[in-house]
């Protein structure tokens, strides 16, 4: 799962990143195109990383601990695998040849060739740059989903509460990619305010049905720094999760479900200096000269998600060892599985 995650995340900062550098030469058109091209991977990351916070409404006993190691995958809807190129949306970017349906980063191979046409009305000249549209990484993946591994430590608190901490140290790749995660969540029991009654011996009955509320915040820093130049891509993702949880908890098994809300914010900055060579032509298509242009820090992009979510899952409990899995219905459905340890 870790290898799969690195392939998906770092592909847009390293190998596939080089494919759409030429887009930056299209001035303001670049932000529109790159936003559409990269949107599914960032939306998927926000949904995937904001999952798997809880596996029961029952809080951990005060000052006891639970360690969960899980992996989530946000499945990319088919309509996010490509986008239609509408010439009216762009000032300089055009299709040279090929279909106007262009793959996103989570799509397949591209069959489209693009061109940038910048007219100079004063001298009746045009600047022309041609290149292949970037392709996607769908064929490199076992399933078309954006993955997100997570390690979470939880501690029980007094008053029927629990705190969750997520942390991933900075992961780096040989080509300059990096990733770091930090998140915190709090769960509070609602069912504790409803008495369960007493048995025939005067002892409190065992509670099997539990209700709780949970809130969480998470931040991710990731990106790519070219070790041989000043080029870089820096990504920051912040997410918020609010949910109500219900669970049936028995000695060996917990069945849980939740209904909640997800909110996410993402920024991506493309930094550095990029040089481009234009073929300058007259209005009849005759070559006049080659002109080189430099562009610095070409992109600052913003993405956001918000919406309701509903989840169902189970947890198998074997002494101190646990196995859990669940599925969340939302814009990008998320499947989660993992193991846990209680101590």
What are these regions (language model features)?
Residues 1-22:
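Bacterial Sec-dependent N-terminal signal peptides
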Residues 20-45, 73-122, 224-318:
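Outer-membrane beta-barrel transmembrane domain signature
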């Amino acid at each position: 799962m870790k290898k799969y995650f690195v392939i998906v995340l770092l592909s847009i900062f390293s190998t596939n990143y080089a494919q759409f550098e030429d887009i930056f030469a299209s001035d303001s058109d670049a932000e529109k195109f790159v936003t559409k091209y990269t949107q599914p991977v960032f939306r998927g990351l926000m949904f995937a990383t904001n999952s798997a916070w809880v596996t029961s409404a029952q809080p951990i006993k005060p000052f006891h601990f639970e360690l969960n190691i899980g992996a989530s995958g946000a499945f990319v809807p088919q309509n996010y695998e490509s986008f239609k190129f509408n010439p009216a949306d762009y000032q300089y970017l055009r299709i040279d040849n090929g279909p106007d349906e262009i793959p996103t980063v989570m799509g397949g191979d591209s069959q489209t060739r693009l061109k940038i046409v910048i007219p100079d009305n004063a001298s009746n000249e045009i600047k022309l740059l041609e290149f292949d549209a970037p392709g996607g990484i769908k064929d490199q993946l076992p399933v078309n989903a954006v993955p997100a591994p997570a390690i979470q430590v939880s501690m029980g608190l007094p008053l029927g509460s629990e705190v969750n901490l997520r942390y991933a140290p900075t992961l780096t790749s040989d080509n300059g990619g990096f990733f770091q995660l930090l998140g915190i969540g709090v769960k509070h029991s609602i069912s504790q305010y409803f008495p369960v009654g007493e048995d025939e011996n005067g002892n409190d009955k065992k509670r099997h049905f539990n209700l709780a509320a949970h809130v969480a915040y998470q931040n991710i820093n990731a990106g790519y720094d070219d070790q041989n130049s000043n080029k870089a891509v820096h990504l920051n993702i912040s997410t918020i999760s609010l949910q109500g949880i219900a669970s049936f908890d028995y000695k060996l098994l917990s069945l849980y479900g939740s209904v909640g809300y997800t909110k996410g914010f993402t920024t991506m900055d493309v930094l550095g200096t990029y040089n481009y060579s234009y073929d300058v032509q007259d209005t009849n298509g005759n070559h006049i000269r080659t002109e080189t242009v430099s562009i610095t820090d070409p992109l600052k992009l913003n993405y956001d998600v918000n919406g309701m979510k509903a989840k169902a899952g189970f947890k198998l409990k074997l002494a101190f060892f646990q196995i859990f899995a669940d599925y969340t219905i939302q814009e990008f459905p998320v499947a989660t599985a993992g193991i846990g340890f209680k101590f």
